[in-house]
């Protein structure tokens, strides 16, 4: 595999910088400072120190014995990003970008958020580093994730409701970029996934690869070999790239799981790689959901963190060369997996992560007991419990099983 991205920020045909002239200079400044920071051992050590002492890394690699036994197939392991401070993988990237922002002398952070986890992570690091934070969030997502909205405000962030479009992640990103264009002198735009113009996909990957680096070391120590299959959910795709990147050169099957919503043959899904075509969104060439006139088709998923109409350009590249297989899981399959993991292992996953669990369960059933499946459990499900109650029709005091 060629080294990507190249000097133009391209992953094969994908990536690049499709932005207005006003953003070229800020992006070049970030790229220059990022490269310097990544080459600076003291920056790397400070990043690792904060991950360990503030976020609680390394996160454990957990064997799932009950789920494994129930399925009767491959051994299932979970990389526990749900045990990070703030409850998801998003904090890895937020710490890295906040450190870079401070190094560049920026005083204020801008973030967009879908499920709210990146917004919470941005607000958290802003509080930790003594910076201001403004978070753009679609009004629809704010309704779905009221708890995270309150968390962000509690942490001192200003949360701006976005009323345009579908009022979800795409629209929040549009507004965040508009705001950044007008305030790039003293603000740092902290993108939450491996999307956007170069150098963001590379930067977020570099701050998320700690997931895969740790998992590789832990798996080798525990099993004496690498996993046969690794599964991760894909919206923008930062947890998946973070997990996959250190394994790209190894003989390991990599499976990304998109949101099939109500079915990929309906208009209600967010399966960008399965159903999308090449186009530019938020400054990068990638696959996206668009009509014949190039207008964005609004995505849908039960998961606020997966209903993005594009995908990280590195994922588009990995799909195009066949290195990673991308599949999709419906709302109902994800809901079933959400309940299954809770009831077999006592671990409530984020609804995003439940998409990966659903696909891993399907794959593990077809495998032998001497094979292994590693799931990136990207976040915990506390934020989704209220939504799940409504979805399952559970009334207070009622048994979950009887509500179905």
From Swiss-Prot:
Pathway linked to the protein: Amino-acid biosynthesis; L-tryptophan biosynthesis; L-tryptophan from chorismate: step 5/5
GO molecular function, one term: tryptophan synthase activity
N6-(pyridoxal phosphate)lysine found at: 90
GO CC, alphabetical: cytoplasm
PROSITE patterns, sorted: TRP_SYNTHASE_BETA
Enzyme Commission code: 4.2.1.20
Cofactor: pyridoxal 5'-phosphate
InterPro entries hit by this protein: Trp_synth_b_CS (IPR006653), Trp_synth_beta (IPR006654), Trp_synth_beta/beta-like (IPR023026), TrpB-like_PALP (IPR001926), TrpB-like_PALP_sf (IPR036052)
Span of the signal peptide: none
UniProt record similarity statement: Belongs to the TrpB family.
Cited HAMAP family: Trp_synth_beta
Functional note: The beta subunit is responsible for the synthesis of L-tryptophan from indole and L-serine.
Subunit annotation: Tetramer of two alpha and two beta chains.
Protein name: Tryptophan synthase beta chain
Species in which this protein is naturally found: Geobacillus thermodenitrificans (strain NG80-2)
Gene this chain is encoded by: trpB
């Amino acid at each position: 595999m060629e080294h990507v991205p190249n000097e133009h920020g391209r992953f094969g045909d994908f990536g690049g910088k499709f932005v207005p002239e006003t953003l070229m200079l800020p992006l070049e400044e970030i790229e220059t400072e990022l490269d310097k920071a990544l080459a600076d051992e003291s920056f790397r050590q400070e990043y690792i120190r904060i991950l360990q002492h503030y976020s609680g890394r390394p996160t454990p690699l957990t064997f799932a014995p009950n789920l494994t036994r129930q399925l009767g197939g491959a051994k299932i392991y979970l990389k526990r990003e749900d045990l990070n401070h703030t409850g998801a993988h998003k904090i890895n990237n937020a710490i890295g970008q906040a450190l870079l922002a401070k190094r560049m002398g920026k005083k204020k952070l801008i973030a967009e958020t879908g499920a709210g986890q990146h917004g919470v992570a941005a607000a958290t690091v802003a509080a930790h580093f003594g910076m201001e934070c403004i978070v753009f969030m679609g009004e629809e997502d704010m309704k779905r994730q009221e708890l995270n909205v309150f968390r962000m405000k509690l942490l001192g962030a200003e949360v701006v409701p976005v009323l345009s479009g579908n009022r979800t992640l795409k629209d929040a990103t549009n507004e965040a970029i508009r705001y950044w264009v007008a305030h790039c002198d003293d603000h740092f735009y902290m993108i939450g996934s491996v999307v956007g113009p170069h150098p963001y996909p590379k930067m977020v990957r570099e701050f998320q690869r700690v997931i895969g680096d740790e998992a590789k070391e832990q798996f080798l120590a525990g099993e004496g070999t690498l996993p046969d299959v690794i599964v991760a959910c894909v919206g923008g795709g930062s947890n998946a790239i973070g997990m996959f990147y250190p394994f790209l050169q190894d003989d390991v099957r990599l499976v990304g799981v998109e949101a099939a919503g109500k079915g990929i043959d309906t208009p209600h899904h967010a399966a960008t790689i399965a159903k999308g075509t090449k186009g530019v969104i938020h400054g990068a060439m990638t696959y996206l959901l668009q009509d014949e006139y190039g207008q964005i088709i609004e995505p849908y998923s039960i998961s606020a963190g997966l209903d993005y109409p594009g995908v990280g350009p590195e994922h588009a590249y990995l799909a195009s060369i066949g290195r990673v297989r991308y599949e999709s899981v419906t709302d109902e399959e994800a809901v079933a997996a959400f309940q299954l993991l809770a009831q077999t292992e006592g671990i409530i996953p984020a609804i995003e992560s439940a998409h990966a669990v659903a696909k891993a369960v399907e794959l593990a059933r077809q495998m032998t007991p001497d094979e292994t499946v590693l799931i990136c459990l990207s976040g915990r499900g506390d934020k989704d419990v209220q939504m799940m109650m409504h979805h399952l029709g559970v009334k207070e005091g009622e048994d979950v099983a009887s509500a179905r």
